[in-house]
A protein has these predicted regions:
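Extreme N-terminal starter segment of soluble prokaryotic enzymes
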Residues: 5-11
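Active-site-proximal loop/helix segment associated with metal-binding centers of metalloenzymes
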Residues: 19-44, 144-239
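Glycine/Thr-rich phosphate-binding loops of Rossmann-like dinucleotide-binding domains
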Residues: 20, 99-100, 227, 279
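Pre-active-site segment of Zn-dependent metallo-hydrolases
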Residues: 21-94, 100-104, 203-210
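Short, well-ordered beta-strand micro-motif
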Residues: 48-50, 184-186, 303-305
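Active-site neighborhood of phospho(di)ester-bond hydrolases with catalytic His/Asp-centered motifs
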Residues: 58-62, 85-97, 115-116, 195-200, ...
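Cap/insert and terminal regions of metallo-dependent hydrolase folds
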Residues: 180, 191-193, 201-301
């Protein structure tokens, strides 16, 4: 069934965490299976949003953006032009898997780039290549409304979530409420709302309230267990130190939000899933736990409508 003309359209461009699946330097069970064709490959995290299915905006710009755009005909330029139907790129933080794609887009800057002042200043002050993007880059304060599309149908607001300074900025910048954000997008025509929160250090009451007020939620699914990466690579930091709430901890609270779509309920999907996370295998016990709780694992190429 085609979306209603007034529906917000959502395309999952990438559902993996940084490095994708398979990750080039990893021999974990999921990466081995993905190389052998046993698991679908996944690209690094990003969403595309549209008010009309014609012009689009991106939530974060992953290093895989060139491939992601190529795989989505709606974001192809019209024949004979370089007019990409892209209005806005919104950044939720300064993690490299969320911003490196901006440098790929530099040759055809979108209508605008939007982030918090902290994210904009950190990138422009400490990473010279991003200065090429300064003319298109606007800063939005927390909870400041920003129209994603030219007609103003989709209103975006960034709100703070628990997080940390990206590793590449360690020692260069201090943590601030604007450092790590999630995105709330409301369709002014219908009142329906999406929340995208790919990096959350812990599921606090404020973040949970934002999710509870949304009709479609994407939440940090980086790791299933806090010690997951440590078991794969001894000496590695745990999930909390990396700024990610493990699924094992967030699932009980998120399960209270998920309701069957058939009854007008709320869909809750995990995204930003690390290659080490066993939920990438649909047959794993961990994936079964997520499904039984009424939640989903986002998939590359998945399309939804609100």
């Amino acid at each position: 069934m085609s979306p209603a003309p007034s529906a917000m359209r959502v395309r999952v461009l990438g559902s993996s965490a940084g490095g994708g699946l398979p990750q080039w330097n990893c021999g974990c069970p999921q990466c081995v299976r993905a190389r052998a064709g046993g698991l679908a490959p996944r690209r690094q995290p990003s969403l595309a949003l549209s008010a009309d299915g014609v012009r689009w905006s991106l939530v974060n710009a992953s290093p895989d953006v060139r491939d992601q755009l190529a795989r989505f005909p709606a974001l192809h330029p019209r024949p004979g032009t370089r007019d990409l139907p892209l209005d806005t790129v919104v950044l939720t933080n300064a993690d490299l898997d969320h911003v490196l794609g901006l440098l790929v887009l530099r040759e055809a800057l979108p209508h605008r780039i939007v982030s918090t002042p902290w994210v904009r200043d950190a990138l422009l002050e400490h990473a010279a290549p991003w200065r090429l993007l300064a003319p298109a880059w606007g800063a939005a304060k927390l909870d400041q409304p920003v129209a994603l599309d030219r007609e103003g149908h989709l209103e975006a607001r960034l709100f703070p979530v628990p997080g940390k300074v990206p590793g590449w900025l360690s020692g260069l910048a201090s943590n601030h409420p604007e450092t790590t954000t999630a995105l709330r997008v409301t369709d002014a025509r219908t009142g329906r709302r999406l929340v995208y929160a790919p990096g959350v250090a812990r599921l606090d009451d404020g973040t949970l309230a934002e999710l509870a007020a949304a009709d479609l939620c994407f939440f940090d699914g980086t790791f299933f267990a806090a010690d997951e990466l440590t078991r794969t690579r001894p000496g590695a930091p745990d999930a909390h130190a990396m700024g990610h709430a493990p699924i094992a901890e967030s699932l009980p609270r998120l399960a209270e939000l998920a309701r069957p779509v058939s009854s007008g309920g709320r869909r809750v999907l995990y995204i930003h899933v690390n290659n080490t996370n066993p939920v990438l295998d649909p047959g794993s016990p961990e994936a079964s736990v997520v499904r039984r709780a009424g939640l989903e694992i986002a998939m590359d190429g998945q399309e939804l409508a609100l």
